[in-house]
């Protein structure tokens, strides 16, 4: 057989071999009306995607355990903390805490070895509320959170997380109070509402995904070193005497693969800045986001003058009166179409390997 014939046969074989592409590289649509259909097409159930997902996650999703909890203590355990204690370290299966409506007045910490845990609110129209009033004065800032998650593959669906401590007045030392700290890798949040004032959400480290969420606060109310996408999420700056600051991303150098991406979100509330350069190479992107006129024209704040050449604050095709770029600070980058296409996708958090649709628990 000639070389040409061999090449033809090989080419024919290759044409019939199915090629699995990384579909999480598809750009997030600019039209919010298309988000759900786009998302459902890419992030399909684990049964369809076993070949491309983390093997340990596939195994965990194949052996699910459901724990039912009620706020009056009449569920399978008296409290969320008791239920968490029942889960062994190095857990290898998905454990779902199915939460009935009500107030769960607890400070909850999920240790770094308790993987594959889901908090699931049974009624999206009457969501369970996890509430506590810890402050930095008592616990330290990052440990003041009502919910602390240090393990991997955590997920929350239909949940309110509240830090009920009073608003800092600038006089009380240690008044900042977090509602949620997420320090584990590969975590997802669907229809989760997070309430606080200063330091509401510590998006600490790891890859995270937020969809259809609500986050409110005052100063630095989303902060940390995570690499996270916020999709169709409302960021509410609580009005007050001083302007709010939405983000304080903690990237120190360009070698760190971290950053916050807000895509198809909404910025509401009182006067606010989109972020400040808490660390020299802070990286934050806002794209396709609706911004009210309460956004200060400069948009962003430098903590130190030398940060001007090192921060990575970017905007792309935002809308609304607060999105006007005419008076934006000169260190803010307006992304090109090519740059936006490269960075505004689920591929930035390797979603094809771990991100799953929101869990729907069918209970008898």
Swiss-Prot record:
Which residues constitute the signal peptide according to the record? 1-22
- Catalyzed reaction equations: [(1->4)-alpha-D-galacturonosyl methyl ester](n) + n H2O = [(1->4)-alpha-D-galacturonosyl](n) + n methanol + n H(+)
Q: Which GO terms describe its molecular function?
A: pectinesterase activity
Q: Does the keyword Signal apply?
A: yes
Gene Ontology biological-process entries: cell wall modification; pectin catabolic process
Pfam families linked: Pectinesterase
Principal location listed in the UniProt entry: secreted
Q: Does the keyword Secreted apply?
A: yes
How is activity affected by pH?
Optimum pH is 5.5-6.0.
Q: Which UniProt keywords apply?
A: Allergen, Aspartyl esterase, Glycoprotein, Hydrolase, Secreted, Signal
Q: What is this protein called?
A: Pectinesterase 1
Look up and give the organism this protein is from: Olea europaea (Common olive)
